[in-house]
From Swiss-Prot:
GO terms for biological process: DNA replication, Okazaki fragment processing. It comes from the Bacteria. PANTHER family: 5'-3' EXONUCLEASE FAMILY PROTEIN (PTHR42646:SF2), FLAP ENDONUCLEASE XNI (PTHR42646). GO terms for molecular function: 5'-3' exonuclease activity; 5'-flap endonuclease activity; DNA binding. The gene is ypcP. 5'-3' exonuclease acting preferentially on double-stranded DNA. It holds the Pfam family 5_3_exonuc. Keywords: DNA-binding, Exonuclease, Hydrolase, Nuclease. Its EC number is 3.1.11.-. InterPro entries: 5-3_exonucl_a-hlix_arch_N (IPR020046), 5-3_exonuclease (IPR002421), 5-3_exonuclease_C_sf (IPR036279), DNA_polI_H3TH (IPR020045), FEN (IPR038969), HhH2 (IPR008918), PIN-like_dom_sf (IPR029060). Residues 175-262 form the 5'-3' exonuclease domain. This is 5'-3' exonuclease. It comes from Bacillus subtilis (strain 168). CDD domains: H3TH_53EXO, PIN_53EXO.
């Protein structure tokens, strides 16, 4: 038995959440170099608090690498409804990665894939080597829940999480975590802009998958459904198949990473230097507290 505890952080979710929490008041915390730091400031607060809360031995922060992925090849309009990031956020992507690295945290991203796919790949890769906690604001990652993987969903404020295990997810929804893929395939996702089956909403999608467990079994028993539902699914088969592929997190991204690479040791001096260099305020005391805990 090992005592490894791996924290997989959805860097995109933390940074976006942190940015918009203060951007609504136009509080961009611009430093002397003219670079906004509000998103990075909040990102670091979320990140350090997660490390304090879950006390991992290993940490990886995962990122999107550009706006286009293999999902755009499957469906041209995937996420096409999303507007471009605000100009004040754009320079903070690289700054957030730099900040995480200076703390001693490994960053991972892979062109053509989303942060979710990197998280799923690492969760699969290290399932036999560590207990894994995923920190995110994205419910799509609940499909990754297993006996070895829990998911901490960010709630309002910093340090507030709703932690799911495979068991608590089933208790809440009546389906197994992997079934979330088929549910999303049926109902679609307006945020990611894929259609699902026209006329099938969330309530019906959950009901159908609770009863039939998978889309494959649902299709085998299509004749048992009410005529209206049969017609909707038959007419939407191609969208259903495509949406299923879009909903599933890809867990075999070719990442070159060992668990040893992700070992976390707080780099206090270089982290403090980075904060001073970029004039990121209010973080150093959090680091000192974290460092004191590590020394003990």
């Amino acid at each position: 038995m090992n005592n490894n505890k791996l924290l997989l952080v959805d860097g995109m979710a933390l940074l976006f959440r942190a940015f918009f929490a203060t951007a609504v008041h136009r509080n961009f915390m611009i430093n002397d170099s003219g670079v906004p730091t509000n998103g990075v400031n909040g990102f670091l607060k979320h990140l350090i608090t997660a490390v304090e809360t879950f006390q991992p031995t290993h940490v990886v922060c995962c990122w999107d690498m550009g706006s286009k992925t293999y999902r755009n090849d499957l469906f041209q309009d995937y996420k096409a409804n999303r507007s471009a990031p605000p100009v004040e956020l754009i320079p903070q992507f690289d700054l957030a990665k730099e900040a995480a690295a200076e703390l001693g945290i490994m960053n991972i991203g892979f062109a053509g894939y989303e942060a979710d796919d990197c998280i799923g790949t690492l969760a699969d890769l290290f399932a036999n080597e560590a207990d894994i906690t995923v920190v995110t604001g994205d419910r799509d990652l609940l499909q990754l829940l297993t006996d070895k993987v829990s998911v901490a969903l960010l709630q309002k404020g910093i340090g507030n999480y709703k932690v799911y295990t495979k068991e608590t997810f089933y208790e809440e929804t009546g389906v197994m975590p992997k079934a979330l893929i088929d549910i999303k395939a049926l109902m679609g996702d307006s945020s990611d802009n894929y259609p699902g089956v026209k006329g099938i909403g969330e309530k019906t999608a959950y009901k159908l998958i609770r009863e039939y467990e998978t889309i494959d079994r649902l299709l085998e028993n299509l004749s048992l459904l009410p005529k209206g539902q049969q017609g909707k699914i038959q007419q939407g088969l191609s969208d259903l198949e495509m949406s299923r592929k879009l909903a599933e997190i890809h867990c075999s991204v070719p990442l070159a990473c060992t668990l040893k690479d992700a070992l976390f040791t707080l780099q206090m001096e270089q982290a403090a230097d980075m904060l001073r260099r970029h004039q990121i305020k209010g973080i150093e005391r959090m680091l000192e507290k974290l460092n004191a805990r590590e020394i003990v």
